[in-house]
């Protein structure tokens, strides 16, 4: 058996030519969430410091489980450049509805104390949307990879509610869409208003879906060699609809795939997009930052 490949925290990349924003990440709300690799666990503030040094000067951190709402808002209040997206994650929505059947991937979900009835959880989201640190509703949507059939109805109910509350609050909506493209698009067509700012976070659709006119946020997977469909989607998207994100601590871009992810590592994804666009790094950064401002406004 070959020795296990080391998966350290990525080195800090060279600074970008212009500042950018991580449109979707998950900052650790508790120290125990930070992975330790080769004896190193980068603290929240060290992750943010590295991000600033490479030019990722602001970020939107998604809290999509009830216990994380207030800690994430507190983090944003105390740290320059950090803003928050709030929602009940689709997999959480099923648990709030009491659906804990084994999922298609073989895992059995665990209902916890914080899984209050779904209507109470949704009310907790809406009650916090007026906080000045909250700039988006998200991530909400559908996830058929991790949820069995009974839970999918709860996901649909939750998704509709999030679309409506984002519209009422005049906030953009970050969408989680995993193996559920058709139903996600159907519900958007049914519930979303014509001028809603809709962002498909960690975009996973194809070129045809990219032509529908919503924002698409690309994460590390666009750098993976097998993901030609993602690159085809980027090629047909108007550049003013393209955003960039990490979805950290997941989906680390090449050349650090498999290692822990954080906002500072997004520089690799930005440079990859610049190459695909065949523009200078500075031009790509300026375009991505302008797109972010069009969706969320500016706080940096």
Regions found by a protein language model. Give the residues of each.
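Mid-domain alpha/beta scaffold segments of enzyme catalytic cores
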Residues: 1-300
């Amino acid at each position: 058996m070959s020795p296990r490949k080391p998966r350290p925290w990525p080195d800090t990349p060279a600074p970008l030519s212009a500042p950018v924003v991580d449109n979707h990440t998950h900052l650790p709300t508790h120290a125990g969430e930070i992975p330790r690799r080769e004896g190193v666990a980068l603290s929240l503030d060290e992750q943010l410091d590295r991000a600033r040094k490479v030019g990722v000067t602001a970020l939107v951190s998604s809290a999509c489980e009830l216990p994380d709402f207030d800690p994430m808002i507190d983090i944003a209040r105390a740290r320059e450049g950090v803003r928050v997206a709030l929602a009940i994650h689709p997999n959480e929505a099923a648990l709030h509805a009491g659906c804990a059947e084994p999922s298609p991937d073989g895992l059995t979900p665990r209902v916890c104390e914080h899984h209050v009835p779904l209507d109470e959880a949704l009310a907790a989201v809406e009650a916090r949307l007026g906080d000045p640190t909250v700039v988006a509703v998200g991530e909400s949507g559908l996830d058929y990879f991790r949820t069995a059939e009974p839970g999918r109805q709860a996901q649909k109910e939750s998704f509709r509610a999030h679309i409506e509350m984002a519209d009422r609050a005049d906030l953009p909506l970050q969408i989680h869409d995993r193996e559920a493209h058709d139903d996600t698009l159907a519900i958007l067509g049914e519930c979303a208003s014509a001028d809603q700012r809709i962002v498909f976070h960690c975009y996973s659709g194809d070129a045809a879906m990219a032509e529908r006119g919503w924002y698409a946020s690309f994460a590390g997977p666009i750098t993976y060699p097998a993901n030609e469909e993602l690159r085809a989607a980027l090629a047909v998207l108007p550049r003013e609809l393209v955003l960039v994100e990490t979805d950290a601590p997941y989906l680390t871009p090449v050349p650090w795939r498999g290692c822990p992810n954080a906002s500072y590592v997004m520089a690799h994804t930005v440079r990859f997009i610049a190459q695909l666009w065949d523009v200078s790094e500075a031009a790509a950064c300026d375009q991505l930052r302008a797109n972010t401002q069009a969706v969320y406004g500016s706080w940096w």
